[in-house]
Amino acid sequence: MSVFVYPGSFDPVTNGHMDIIQRAAKLCDKLVVAVLVNSSKNPVFTLEERVDLLKCAVKGIDNVEIESFSGLLIDFMRKKNSKVIIKGLRAVSDFEYELQMALLNKNLDSDIETLFMMTNINYSFLSSSSVRELARHNGNIDGLVPDCIKDKIMDKFRR
């Protein structure tokens, strides 16, 4: 069984992430979307909220599972018996950072492969931080995030 892992903060999940999830899910038997507990980041949405938002967003994609993890991605990959990391790229600037991470992971485990997927051009401008900024100022996030989570995101910033 082929198991791919798509790691990220997903703070919150966007339609750019969903584009990668939907396309990557077609390439493997199981896609694990791994929500990172990152001590160097200060997420707006709690870990539980990010997992819940993703679970709502991936309903109907049968071979996708949502899990959280902390620590090294390589250790999580071993637990999942996975050899493939999925990374979405919007621009060359994403590639520079992700290439460094891919080389580091390859150095830690030579069997690990990183599969880079270009985001659909319609989402090349989109980031979780831009969604948060729009929501923070009561801007329109229609079409930027899955419909099933739009109100939850806006509610987070109305508090």
Swiss-Prot record:
Record localization: Cytoplasm
Residue numbers marked as site, Transition state stabilizer: 17
Residues binding substrate, per UniProt: 9, 41, 73, 87
GO biological-process terms attached to the record: coenzyme A biosynthetic process
Superkingdom per UniProt: Bacteria
GO MF annotation, one: ATP binding
GO cellular component terms, A-Z: cytoplasm
Reaction equations catalysed: (R)-4'-phosphopantetheine + ATP + H(+) = 3'-dephospho-CoA + diphosphate
SUPFAM superfamilies xrefs: Nucleotidylyl transferase
Gene3D superfamilies per UniProt: HUPs
EC numbers for this chain: 2.7.7.3
Keywords: ATP-binding, Coenzyme A biosynthesis, Cytoplasm, Magnesium, Nucleotide-binding, Nucleotidyltransferase, Transferase
InterPro entries named in the record: Cyt_trans-like (IPR004821), PPAT (IPR001980), Rossmann-like_a/b/a_fold (IPR014729)
One Pfam family hit: CTP_transf_like
Keyword Magnesium listed: yes
UniProt-annotated binding residues for ATP: 9-10, 17, 88-90, 98, 123-129
Cofactor: Mg(2+)
Metabolic or biological pathway: Cofactor biosynthesis; coenzyme A biosynthesis; CoA from (R)-pantothenate: step 4/5
Protein family: Belongs to the bacterial CoaD family.
Assembly, per entry: Homohexamer.
NCBIfam families with a match to the protein in the record: coaD_prev_kdtB, cyt_tran_rel
Its job: Reversibly transfers an adenylyl group from ATP to 4'-phosphopantetheine, yielding dephospho-CoA (dPCoA) and pyrophosphate.
Official protein name in the record: Phosphopantetheine adenylyltransferase
Protein species of origin: Acetivibrio thermocellus (strain ATCC 27405 / DSM 1237 / JCM 9322 / NBRC 103400 / NCIMB 10682 / NRRL B-4536 / VPI 7372) (Clostridium thermocellum)
